[in-house]
Amino acid sequence: DGLVWPTVRVDEAYREGLDAISLTEHIEYRPHKKDIIADHNRSYELSQKQAKKLGILLIRGSEITRSMPPGHFNAIFLNDSNPLEQKAYKDAFNEAKKQGAFIFWNHPGWARQQPDSTLWWPEHTQLYNDGCMHGIEVANGGLFMPEAIQWCLDKNLTMIGTSDIHQPIQTDYDFSKGEHRTMTFV
């Protein structure tokens, strides 16, 4: 659902000094489906050559995009994103798990999905117990979710910070003022 070509994301990452990037296109939400073929690996394939040229580690990933609960999750370190397109969300998660993906819950405090509060649902407990949740996004652009930090501490989950950018990066961040994307240090 991004508004820039995948190689542009790699170029942006290089200019910002990042070592790795994952382009996690939505599996279920495809606002440009009339114009773009639904091969969920295509963004990765298009940007591989540029990433290699610039020395950027490109991580194959996709976003499992469901209503709450369970919400939106990224699965990274996939072998093939296409099998994640499943009717039942549990089947999509099990496919990601089968591929050895690292799966994390995106923006649990996003007002579009949880307008009144940030809640941990029974579906999240099930995903966690099934080994289908390894982390939680605690920061997403300007969105900060303190509840998610506590859940990570309580459940020994990885804390993630991401940019979740859909348009050119300079649209969201003013580099001349020292602003930068949210990121995870590894």
Role assignments for model-derived ranges:
Residues D11, Q48, E123-Q126, D174-S176:
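Homeobox/homeodomain signature
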Residues D1-F102, N106, G131, V138-P168:
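A metal-dependent hydrolase metal-coordination microenvironment
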Residues L57-L58, E137, H180, F185:
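Catalytic-core segments of hydrolase enzymes
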Residues W110-E147:
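Active-site-proximal segments of metal-dependent phosphoesterases and phosphodiesterases across multiple
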Residues H124-Y128, T158, T171:
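A structural motif
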Residues P70-N74, Q113-P122, P146-C152, I169-V186:
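Histidine/acidic-residue-rich catalytic or RNA/ligand-binding cores of hydrolases
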